């Protein structure tokens, strides 16, 4: 029996009709209907017969089936119960796919990887991420104690640009710092709205993030470090001096201490957050230990 690619307008429409499926806007459902785009995603991910893939939001399986053809195993998390019978149908030719009907943010990913991908030499996250929760999903996966080698993911263009942004640019912010702390980021391609059904309201981008062997800087408390960096961008037009006065408890009373702390790290208090590198924030984080008055 010959199987037609799912990622075509005609096959997707036929499946929608067959299952009486209606898109849920609340779940950010936009299905890929262009095999060429999917092939570029596969190519960028460098998956092969030794790779285990984690997919989030497989939809009707348009990307999943191509992953199954190229990877050793695919584990796909789908939150929408209505899509489970569709996926069981569309992916029936492939015995290397596991569909998990669960919210990726609530799932025990380490256990799932140990159960389904334990015999894979490397693990990649390859997905057309639901746009409304792209950032929480990525941060959750980056911070898992799971040997993920990298990500090739489709997302809203604006979010992708923030992940990949360089210091001093408009898009650079706390998300750039977290992503680049854990991974080396690069843009794969920009994707037009026309390759989705239904078309999203925003432009899309595919971004590649490869896990670093070691984080970009060494800190003893990642959560505290990220909070400190995020505070510098609380009000982008304000100086870091002003932002940190608002961030720290009794910051207004400790203006002079904040100024001394910034200067001890070699940072001009009049600078804005977007001009500070990740290394600058790491220095600030270390220097803060010398100023016991600065608490939050």
Curated annotation (Swiss-Prot):
Gene3D superfamilies in the record: Ribosomal RNA adenine dimethylase-like, domain 2, Vaccinia Virus protein VP39
Compartment(s): Cytoplasm
Binding residues annotated for S-adenosyl-L-methionine, in chain numbering: 30, 32, 57, 78, 103, 128
This enzyme's EC code(s): 2.1.1.182
Keywords: Cytoplasm, Methyltransferase, RNA-binding, rRNA processing, S-adenosyl-L-methionine, Transferase
InterPro entries: KsgA/Erm, rRNA_Ade_diMease-like_C, rRNA_Ade_Mease_Trfase_CS, rRNA_Ade_methylase_Trfase_N, rRNA_adenine_dimethylase, SAM-dependent_MTases_sf
Catalytic reactions on record: adenosine(1518)/adenosine(1519) in 16S rRNA + 4 S-adenosyl-L-methionine = N(6)-dimethyladenosine(1518)/N(6)-dimethyladenosine(1519) in 16S rRNA + 4 S-adenosyl-L-homocysteine + 4 H(+)
EC class (word): transferase
GO molecular function, one term: RNA binding
Domain of life: Bacteria
Main location: cytoplasm
GO cellular component assignments: cytosol
Keyword check for Methyltransferase: yes
Residue spans crossing the bilayer: none
Function: Specifically dimethylates two adjacent adenosines (A1518 and A1519) in the loop of a conserved hairpin near the 3'-end of 16S rRNA in the 30S particle. May play a critical role in biogenesis of 30S subunits.
Family stated for the protein in its record: Belongs to the class I-like SAM-binding methyltransferase superfamily. rRNA adenine N(6)-methyltransferase family. RsmA subfamily.
Protein name (database record): Ribosomal RNA small subunit methyltransferase A
Source organism: Staphylococcus epidermidis (strain ATCC 35984 / DSM 28319 / BCRC 17069 / CCUG 31568 / BM 3577 / RP62A)
Source taxonomy: Bacteria, Bacillati, Bacillota, Bacilli, Bacillales
